[in-house]
């Protein structure tokens, strides 16, 4: 049984003692990193979230403490009191390495079994073990540093927004399911058998209702939930910095959030963000980088060479152009040195993005070498080289197909080449850009209808309104995303505040009037009562912390994350519900075989 504190107070953290504290009597509390014996003395490295302090036990220092220390093992939780003295053998690798504590009193507050993971910086244990024993994983000082950054970031965000007259308002966690986009997490209602709440994917409708309520400027740091197939750096529950403003236009929201980003990155990471942040249309981003989340830390833009090759007698290029597609290319500096095998691997790589293959031209010292040499004339070759701005030693990598495939495959290839050839020179660079003028709709082949690129409440650009019914694919939106180093940091839009336009939007999405009112009637009803022009934005807080903390794994910035299958190794959630609970909720679970037969 562990000893009680009985009034004993900690007077200093383990990482704090310095030479100026020599001669002082202090009390430290923490966990044993290691216990070693040397020359008749015991040396314990005592750790807390601030660092490690060496504590010395000896017969002549205090016999009782020395005897107790012999049984102390790693991860025991202890309290020590003693005098700070200079170390005979200095450890310059530790901030406390010039001093040590001569222990005059030891309390063993609690014992520990042998831990399944070793508590140290840069732990290389298997992820499932780290997540199962997350409370041990979180003892590591580098994990504490991340959550100190997270706490500092949320405070910085709140300070900035409240200084700009934003009001923190909580919105419901139990909401109505509106099946559009990702799947909802459903919560059965005991009071209304057979009916369900949904956990919010975002506070979208409620924050718009707050604008109708006259709140003017709202914000919330809020949990959101999406039951989707998890990709890298996605979690089923995540934290969003959510905001909405009335009587504003797009430029107002972007300027305010540029100020927020500059404030937070300076205060938390000491980074000066250059303002104003550059802007790029969705169309330009796709054509130049093959992505609406371009990584601008390196060049290598996609170049359109359709005009250069349109008269070539090469069926792949010809058929792509005739079908309304294009021929585009990347210029890889130094790529002429690549052998056939790595070029073939790049060809296989683009095929995973539905490209039919990769044509290439290498500009070697002794002439041009190409996978399509027999179709190239000197004039066409020279025209391509000039358009690409290529030089001797370079390689030109070409894809021909419908534009969606060309952009996707070359965009992915661009990022792959950046990894392989280390094209990002400054890994600590923060390169921001706004992406604007997104399409309002995208066509779903699976559902055979148009779906909203962002959500159904995004306002279309006025100049494109005439296309809303006749050519939805041509309509651009008043939506904007903030991209950092190839990752979407946040996104938002100006909202529709006109009931007639909102109904036109629902109709374009394939909703009948009855379906629109059934799903979103409470918003449409509110729009009868003078809604103001409004818009907003939401940042992914978890992703922002990843950048500020310098980690590439989203699980590092969430205290108790799920794995890629939305499973919690620590609590073993989800679990089987008690039969009594299911009965109260009016729920029956189909046997697996019966479920499969019904499907």
Swiss-Prot record:
Chain segments carrying region Aspartate: 204-207
Reported EC number(s) for this entry are 6.1.1.12
Cellular component per GO, a single term: cytoplasm
GO MF annotations in UniProt: aspartate-tRNA ligase activity; ATP binding; catalytic activity, acting on a protein; nucleic acid binding; transferase activity
Q: What Gene Ontology terms for biological process does this UniProt record contain?
A: aspartyl-tRNA aminoacylation
Which Pfam families does UniProt cross-reference here? GAD, tRNA-synt_2, tRNA_anti-codon
Q: Which UniProt keywords apply?
A: Aminoacyl-tRNA synthetase, ATP-binding, Cytoplasm, Ligase, Nucleotide-binding, Protein biosynthesis
Q: Which positions are annotated as binding ATP?
A: 226-228, 235, 488, 540-543
User: Where does the protein principally reside?
Assistant: cytoplasm
Reaction(s) catalysed (UniProt annotation) = tRNA(Asp) + L-aspartate + ATP = L-aspartyl-tRNA(Asp) + AMP + diphosphate
Q: Which residues bind L-aspartate?
A: 180, 226, 454, 495
What superkingdom does the record give?
Answer: Bacteria
Q: Where in the cell is it found?
A: Cytoplasm
PROSITE patterns given for it? AA_TRNA_LIGASE_II (PS50862)
Q: State the InterPro entries in the record.
A: Aa-tRNA-synt_II (IPR004364), aa-tRNA-synth_II (IPR006195), aa-tRNA-synth_II/BPL/LPL (IPR045864), Asp-tRNA-ligase_1 (IPR004524), Asp-tRNA-ligase_1_N (IPR047089), Asp/Asn-tRNA-synth_IIb (IPR002312), AspRS_core (IPR047090), GAD-like_sf (IPR004115)
Q: What does this protein do?
A: Catalyzes the attachment of L-aspartate to tRNA(Asp) in a two-step reaction: L-aspartate is first activated by ATP to form Asp-AMP and then transferred to the acceptor end of tRNA(Asp).
The family note in this entry says:
Belongs to the class-II aminoacyl-tRNA synthetase family. Type 1 subfamily.
Entries under HAMAP family matching the protein:
Asp_tRNA_synth_type1
Its quaternary structure? Homodimer.
Query: Would you tell me the protein name for this molecule?
Result: Aspartate--tRNA ligase
Organism for this UniProt entry: Clostridium botulinum (strain Alaska E43 / Type E3)
């Amino acid at each position: 049984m562990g000893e009680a504190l009985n009034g004993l107070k900690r007077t200093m953290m383990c990482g704090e003692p310095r030479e100026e504290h020599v001669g002082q009597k202090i009390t430290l509390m923490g966990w044993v990193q290691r216990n070693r014996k040397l020359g008749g003395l015991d040396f314990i490295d005592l750790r807390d979230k601030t660092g490690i302090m060496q504590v010395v036990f000896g017969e002549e220092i205090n016999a009782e403490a020395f005897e107790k220390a012999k049984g102390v093992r790693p991860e025991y939780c202890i309290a020590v009191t003693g005098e700070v003295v200079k170390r005979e053998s200095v450890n310059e690798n530790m901030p406390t390495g010039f001093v040590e504590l001569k222990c005059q009193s030891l309390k063993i507050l609690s014992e520990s079994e042998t831990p399944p993971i070793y508590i140290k910086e840069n732990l290389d244990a298997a992820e499932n073990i780290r997540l199962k024993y997350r409370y041990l994983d979180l003892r590591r000082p580098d994990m504490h540093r991340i959550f100190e950054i997270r706490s500092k970031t949320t405070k910085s965000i709140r300070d900035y927004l409240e200084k700009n007259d934003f009001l923190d308002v909580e919105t419901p966690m139990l909401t109505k399911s509106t099946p559009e986009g990702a799947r909802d997490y459903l919560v059965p209602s005991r009071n209304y058998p057979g009916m369900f709440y949904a956990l919010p994917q975002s506070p979208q409708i409620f924050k718009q209702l707050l604008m109708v309520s006259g709140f003017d400027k709202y914000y919330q740091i809020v949990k959101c939930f999406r039951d989707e197939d998890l990709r890298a750096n996605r979690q089923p529950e995540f934290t969003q910095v959510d905001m909405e403003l009335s009587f504003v236009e797009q430029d107002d929201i972007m300027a305010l959030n540029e100020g927020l980003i500059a404030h937070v990155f300076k205060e938390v990471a000491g980074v000066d963000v250059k303002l104003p942040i550059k802007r790029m249309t969705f169309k330009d981003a796709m054509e130049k980088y093959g992505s609406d989340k371009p990584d601008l830390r390196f060049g290598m833009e996609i170049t359109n060479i359709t005009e250069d090759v349109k008269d070539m007698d090469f069926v792949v290029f010809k058929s792509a152009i005739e079908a309304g597609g294009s021929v585009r290319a990347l210029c890889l500096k130094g790529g002429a040195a690549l052998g056939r095998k790595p070029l073939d691997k790049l060809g296989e790589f683009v095929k995973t993005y539905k490209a039919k293959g990769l044509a290439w031209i290498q500009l070697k010292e002794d002439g041009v070498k190409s996978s399509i040499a027999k179709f190239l004339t000197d004039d066409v070759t020279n025209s391509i080289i000039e358009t690409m701005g290529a030089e001797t030693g370079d390689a030109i990598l070409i894809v021909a197909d419908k534009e969606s495939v060309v952009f996707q495959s070359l965009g992915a290839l661009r990022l792959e080449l950046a990894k392989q050839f280390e094209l990002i020179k400054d890994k600590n660079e923060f390169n921001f850009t706004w992406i604007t003028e997104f399409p309002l709709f995208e066509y779903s082949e699976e559902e055979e209808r148009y779906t909203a690129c962002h959500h159904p409440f995004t306002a279309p650009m006025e100049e494109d309104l005439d296309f809303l019914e006749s050519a939805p694919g041509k309509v651009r939106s008043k939506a904007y995303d903030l991209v950092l180093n190839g990752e979407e940091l946040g996104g938002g839009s100006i909202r529709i505040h006109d009931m007639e336009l909102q109904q036109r939007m629902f109709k374009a999405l394939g909703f009948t009037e009855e379906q629109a009112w059934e799903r979103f009637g409470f918003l449409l009803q509110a729009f009868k009562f003078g809604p103001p022009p409004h818009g907003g934005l939401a940042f992914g807080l978890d992703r922002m912390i990843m950048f500020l903390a310098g980690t590439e794994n989203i699980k590092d910035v969430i205290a108790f994350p799920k794995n890629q299958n939305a499973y919690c190794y620590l609590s073993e959630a989800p679990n089987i519900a008690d039969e009594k609970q299911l009965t109260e909720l009016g729920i029956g679970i189909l046997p697996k075989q019966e479920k499969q037969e019904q499907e």
